[in-house]
Amino acid sequence: QLYRLTNTDITDVENEMRALEDAIKEYELILSNDDELKKVVKDELRKVKKEFAHPRKTEIKDEITEIKIDMTDMIPKEDVIVVVTSEGYVKRVSKKSYSALNGEETALKDGDYVIGLFEQNTLDTLLLFTNKGNYLYVPVHTLPELKWKDLGKHVSNLVPIKEDEKVIKALAVSKFDDREIITFTSNGMTKKSLLKDFVVQRYSKPIMFIRLKDNDEVVDVLMEPYNEVFIATKKGYGLWYDKSEIPTIGLKTAGVKAINLKDDNVASACIFDGTFEYVTVITHKGLAKRIKLSEFEKTTRAKRGLLLLREVKSNPQEILKAYVSDAKKMIMLVSDNDTKEIKLTEIPIMDRYSTGSTITKKKLDNVYEVSHLTKDDVTNKKEVTKSVTKEEAKEKKEVSLKEIDDKFMTIDDFLDNFS
């Protein structure tokens, strides 16, 4: 029995050795012969297909060829406070943070002041107009989110502008529609444009909204629901006419003559409610007065107008600003980085030929209306509208499922091409 067991073990070992030798020969053949290697790969893949085969769960149809992704869906919807300053600094602050400040003033550089304070949504748009006839299209969600006491970031960090280019006006827009934007320039030109024409898809650089001559600059950009126009010149002339006198034309045009100038420049312009009674005039030497609007005759565009104050050759004055506005308005006087806030009702009423009353002994650098928080600077004064979806802010990416599917190969395709 022991002999038989030993003989059996020897036979098993010999059989195993022969099997190993055959396997070694087969492996060497596979490694040395590309055709044999490809044959083995095909056999293995067929086994995989047979073992794991199952019907496809997705279906590709010709009429369903793309997916459209609305990039605005990626923007968190949030109500924020937007601040714009005369020096071009911008920021957005969370509404919750702003509400907790109890009326504290925002941080500003010396001599800087706020020209726009708005309550907006991150899906809204901020339009910034410059003295060089360009506008910056800034989606609110791209503004830097900062604290109320932070200075903000200069707008050139968002859109590159020239060194001598300055932001003169900010408008908050939640809906681009048929409302009118009216532009006035230093050389006495004006034009009317439709808000809907300001929508752009690419906003990485300034966009022209009025064609200027070399020595001209934009004085003001206005969006008001009223119909009365009043323009004042630096040398003291004022002209009153109806807004319908100004034609509606394209963005890249120069406009028409707003007022007839003789060695003069436009100081300011306003669009006002016909029920307002007084024209407020402020000069660079700190003199001011209010004139009854009834002292002026409403006329037509492109005339010289009437004198707003008596000319004194020994003490010449230049008009800084002229307002026809609500008597309850507050204005800020800027001189040597100092500011002084006064009510229009504090300014005395005089006739057109008087020189005015002293409201400050300092020479004024600027005068501006005090900004109050508004939801949409260009909505009707009696109604605030808000749009949640904005077609102009959408960026769509298209992906063809059919093209992607055609790039994939089945195992059978692979085996047929495998050579």
What is each PLM-predicted segment?
Residues 1-419:
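Short, structured "edge-of-domain" segments at secondary-structure transitions
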